[in-house]
Swiss-Prot record:
Keywords: Covalent protein-DNA linkage, DNA replication, DNA-binding, Host nucleus, Phosphoprotein, Viral DNA replication
Family label: Belongs to the adenoviridae terminal protein family.
Species lineage: Viruses, Varidnaviria, Bamfordvirae, Preplasmiviricota, Tectiliviricetes
Protein name: Preterminal protein
Gene: PTP
Record has DNA-binding as a keyword: yes
Keyword DNA-binding: yes
Amino acid sequence: MRATTTAAGITWMSRYIYEYHRLMLEDLAPGAAATLGWPLYREPPPHFLVGYQYLVRTCNDYVFDSRAYSRLRYTETVQPGTQTVNWSVMTNCSYTINAGAYHRFVDVDDFATTLTQIQQAVLAERVVADLALLQPLQGYGSTHMADRGNREVEVERLMQDYYKDLGRCQSDVWGMADRLRIQQAGPKDVVLLKTIRGLKTAYFNYIISSIAQLPGTLEETKLSLPCDCDWLDAFLERFSDPVDMQTLSSLRGVPTQQIIKCIISAVSLPNAPRNASFPILHETELRGGVFELRPRENGRAVTETMRRRRGEMIERFVDRLPVRRRRRRQPPPPVVEEEIMEVEEEEQEIVPGAFQQEVRETVAELIRLLEEELTVAARNSQFFNFAVDFYEAMERLEALGDINELTLRRWILYFFVSEHVATTLNYLFQRLRNYGVFARLVELNLAQVVMRARDSEGGVVYSRVWNEIGLNAFSQLMSRISNDLAATIERAGHGDLQEEEIDQLMAEIAYQDNSGDVQEILRQAAVNDTEIDSVELSFRFKTTGPVVFTQRRQIQDINRRVVAHASQLRAQHLPLPERQADIPLPPLPAGPEPPLPPGARPRRRF
């Protein structure tokens, strides 16, 4: 029966007989409950949609409020000697986050006089989360909630539900994406991710120590470098203290612009800040925080010695970590002592910020090497770099003198939205693209994120759409959304945009034709964010996978009988039996034996 192996035939059978969109979610082992009665008669179905059940389970295992699967279609490809049939489906999953009042904006009578304090407090809460030491939840056992009876609750899922409400979770939400990342990492990745975070923290403490350093600092607090040029361990030991609110509160007298530069320089590691703005250290250029640079060692400029021995020192540092390396590298060649002219040495000494830049480049190179050691599953940093976009937006606002209640509110709201978008897209990427068994067989065709801001009565304030096609759609979406939201922060409180401002905004967000209505973008830019009570996030994506055909003659015979009986009932305008109806197996229709499906073995005759 050729119809069994064609897209049109499978579509007809799926619609009227098997209902594959539901049947594929059942246990289809021979004799299982789902196979009893019509139309399977204790046997698996004649087709199997590879990956469909896993796709649905992936969506069910996440904190989506609603899930829909539409446009289940079958397409056929016929080439000389081969025939394939694929299934495709559009998945739409969504959930709503409560964008209620953030505690920094609650009960503030004189907002203008406390604006700087609020801005620095908001920055401090965020940077503490971005540089906090990562520690995955550990332990075994079950969790029981008083209002959920005897049903066990996963702690991770419970926390994600908690993070949906900004009015309830407040600053606890900051760093949610990174915390979930390390929660899903293996033992080796945990060590590497914690080391990377420790290096960023140490570098931030190092550069912040300079601008916070007061005259008359005790000599004992200084750490002399280059420590035989193997200074990384001493660097981490000296600056490994976690960044906390107490540390940052001591910077109240420091210009916010300078603090933001330090944050961007640390958080953007191992990449260079896009505007290449490095914080400028106090006093001489040969001084870095509480590190004191010796002018020379054995007649050589110290930064030059550090630079020449950088690779060797980094390799030794990684080798000492309690992890097995993915591949052993060739040790760098020994440093060749070359004579350096006195003039060259003098030039080396007076390069502005040479010491600080060498420290950052060393830390950046080490972080890059550690990221290469991560497993493929943990290496997807593209979902966790969005914080840099928002710190840079704050830096631009500070430079423009445009820090006000509206820009701060939007900064917090969009940061909150980005945490959720990053967490969800990373989850989908891990399950649908990074899981090799699924990704080898099922293809991601396109992905879309829809953001609907709603007021307290549920009305839509504005709606944004981002689309991407191809296998890398999830990561490309994250990059676009992060850049888009960060660029729109500067428009808060400016009302409707002028013609030239519209062109500038479209350029800043890298607008694409498939990014929704331009009027919605302009409405988003001009809206007063105090009107927004909640934000609905919808994640839509289309996947395509193969359909496999049974080669068991018994299943083929049952299918022939079922299809013939169903066709007869349809021709007579009679209803078809309900699934699992207890009716006898219809007789085998008369006529010649159907040809074998592609690849099937002929039946043995005795």
